[in-house]
From Swiss-Prot:
One of its GO terms (cellular component) is cytoplasm. Residues 357-385 are annotated as: C-loop. GO terms for molecular function: transferase activity. This is Mannose-1-phosphate guanylyltransferase regulatory subunit alpha.
Amino acid sequence: MLKAVILIGGPQKGTRFRPLSFEVPKPLFPVAGVPMVQHHIEACSKVPNLKEILLIGFYQPNEALSSFLLKAQQEFKVAIRYLQEYSALGTGGGIYHFRDQILSGGPQAFFVMNADVCSAFPLVPMLDFHKQHGGSQSYVILGTTANRSQSLNYGCIVANGETQEVLHYVEKPGTFVSDIINCGIYLFSPSIFQHIAEVFQRNQQELQLEENSSWQRTEVIRLEQDVFTTLAGRGKLYVYKTEGCWSQIKSAGSAIYASRLYLSQYGSTHPERLASTKEGGPTIRGNVYIHPTANVDPSAVLGPNVSIGMGVTVGAGVRIRESIVLHGAVLQDHSCVLNTIVGWDSTVGRWARVEGTPSDPNPNDPYSKIDSETLFREGKLTPSITILGCNVSIPAEVVILNSIVLPHKELSRSFKNQIIL
């Protein structure tokens, strides 16, 4: 029997995803038409003999999360539960805190994955690789190749070229270590908890030496810095390298890139989710997802990489490209939306143009990843995709360029390179 654990974080995390995470927990943000974490759940449901999926995070249980889990459970026919941490315990602390729940039923192995990654999720090949490399006493990290300069932003893995054993692991090194990076998806045997327990006991001993220390801190354990670094070179940790698509979803801008990756996968996994040009319907270019309840005028042109949410209205002559339009939004006649996320129930007026700058990886470098740009550089706002928070109103005939508009704003003029509070 197998299980899967998805680490979904909490409201204090994912702040780079604001203003979109104000309205909905980040793991439930729709990417390519379905909540971000549903892609993980679907991949897990396809693994033979995987009986339970546990979501671990420190969001207060809320209606959106509960109804999503109920629907997912019915759709994918697998048990799904949410376990709430009492505070942020780190990637290792969360699974250690709930180790009894994870080990109940006696799974031979379990997957652990971060909710904010977009991937082809090669879980079955990882499982086969795990069986060939020590099974119950070994652990597998999913790795991919990055270019030299960007590898410094990730966990770097030095591996034996023949056996794929991890010899050395460094989280976000100061200088170049390796171009194989950690994808945030792991396969563990239950014996991993012995190694996490060693870290827990070490933390306890260190805190006993400190005055006025908090007992909570002993439970804060980071898999990457605390566990992998000590396991490397001991013949227990292996890396399974994937050539498939992979990206982090840290900033709101990376959601559009992740949407593109998932939409391109739909061609083989879910062709029914992709729209096509039909007589009497809008013109579709490339991969486009349109929710069945959306109302799109036949003269509109959509794509490539467009995702239209529930109940959206798209008027005559509208052009949308490289964008996500969330539920209830209205794009009035002849408006133009490029490289933008249009928030829930927002309105874009007639002949208005809303445009951002894509934050895509370098297309000429096959190993390039998306850069997590800082919001400001040299005192200026970094050009990025445009984001309209929920319930924003854009008047007719204005241009909004490279701007972030916080929720419930009614704009009256054009803006460029601004955060509108």
